[in-house]
Structures are given as C-alpha cells and as structure tokens.
C-alpha cells in the first residue's frame, strides 16, 4: 500500500488509518463551522419594524434577528453589526459611537428631507444612519366613522370629548407636542384624555376595544386596513410629524452592509413590494407617484398623498 493511503488497522509509520481520516475530517469541519460563525453578521430589528421582503434579500453572511421591541434592540446592540431603529429610539445613541453608513451617491438619490435624519439631525457631519423608510403619524380610529365626518378639524379631533379615556398617544412626548403646537393647555388636555402613551401596544388596545383612537406611524396600520373594516385612518390635510426608519452601524470596524442591498429598496421590483406593505422609502415625490400607480388607488393616496400634506 502506498504511503498516505488509509489502512484499516492503523499500523504503518507513514500511513493514516480510516479512523484518523474521519477524526481529521470532523475536526476540519468543526473548524470551518466555527469560522462561519465568526464571520456571521447580525441585523437586529424589532418585530414589525423592517420590510420583510427587503430583509429576505439580505446577503450572506448577514442574517436578521427579530426582537420583541426597540428596547431589546438597544439592550443587545453590542451583539450586532447593524441595527434598525426609529429616529425616536435612535436619538438615545451617541452619534460619535456609530460608524458611517452608505455613500454620498446613495444619499443623493433620496429626497432632501432625508438628509437630516441621515445625520441623526446634526447640522453637519457624516451619514450615521440609512433612512430607508418614512411614515407620517396618523390618527387611527376604530368604529368611529362619525369622527371621520369632521376630518377637516385635523388633529383637533384628538380633543373630542368622546375620546377621553379611549385614546392612545405615542410614547414620545415630542410627537404629542408637535400635534398640539405650543399651547400647554391643549397639551395637558390631550394627556388627560389618553389611556396610555404606548404606540407599540396601541393596535392591541384598539382591537380589544379598550381604545377607540390612537396616533401611530402610518406603516403600522396598512396591513390591518386590508382585513378589518372597523379601522379607518386619517392623515390631516395640515400635515403630520414624521417617523423615520433607520439602519445604523455599531462603532466597531465591522464590514458595511453591501451598497447594492441598501439601494435595492429604492428600485423596482422591490420598491413596489415594500410600498404594498406600507413602507415608503424617502424618494422624490414624483418618482413615488409614478411607482404608486401600480397600487390600488385608496392605498396609493394614503401612501403618496398630495405633496403639500
């Protein structure tokens, strides 16, 4: 038998037994698997806070890990290379601890309004976040079609006496202040009317009839509109505060997610898929209007309303 050929009995100074070959193969395989694990990179997001069609295209070695809420994403951020957070939750992070993301060419494809959240609202500096989706806050009503007849009142409907104790407000006081302006009396009245300031649980409170109205980012409601005729959405004509979905990198020198994947959400066919699910990338309004022609008209008008709204 030639040197290097496996023998059955393990004898022979320069030969490898079949058992040795199997052990060596197992050890080599374990090493390869460990190497794969070390090369894996995670994107953390809370459930319902990322477009599933886009996340499904995340290339290897990246993988998506879904958590229950944004607080868990923040708590586990040291374990991940990429985070998905709204601008409200991202504001708790130190921008200096975040690595730049994307490119100037990629950011230039977005509407200019997206540049500020891309810098985490700093007046200048590098792009610290990829603002891949934007959603206005909307008024969501359950079985209150009587209030829809007064939609011209806009956000003043929140102060309707019939909603006292039946209203869910955003967790962020900043949003409530934006809705009521600078009037402290109106803001105090709004807070007294709220059953909770907890938008993560607002839909559950609506569906279980513990609330009749809630202020939520538009995207959270779009899937529900298709299956629950009791739910109606009001986007006041005088506008609304915006909620931005952001991707952020940790401060360690992790590899950046592929630019092709970041850009995919801005282009057909994926762009139309995410629009159907209620996600609206912050592209120029004319381009969004053109793509939205592939949607049912009521959904298109909700997602891409006239530019002055």
Predicted regions and their residues:
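A bilobed periplasmic-binding-protein/Venus flytrap-type ligand-binding module shared by bacterial periplasmic
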Residues: 138-146, 242-258, 273-274
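Short beta-strand->loop
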Residues: 101-110, 129, 226-241, 250-251
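Non-transmembrane alpha-helical segments in soluble domains
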Residues: 22, 156-159, 203, 207, ...
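Extracellular/periplasmic juxtamembrane helices and adjacent flexible linkers that interface
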Residues: 256, 260, 264-309
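Ligand-binding pocket segment of bilobal, Venus flytrap-like solute-binding proteins
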Residues: 76, 87-93, 168-239
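N-terminal secretory signal peptides and thylakoid transit peptides that target proteins
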Residues: 4-29
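N-terminal segment of the mature folded domain
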Residues: 37-152, 159
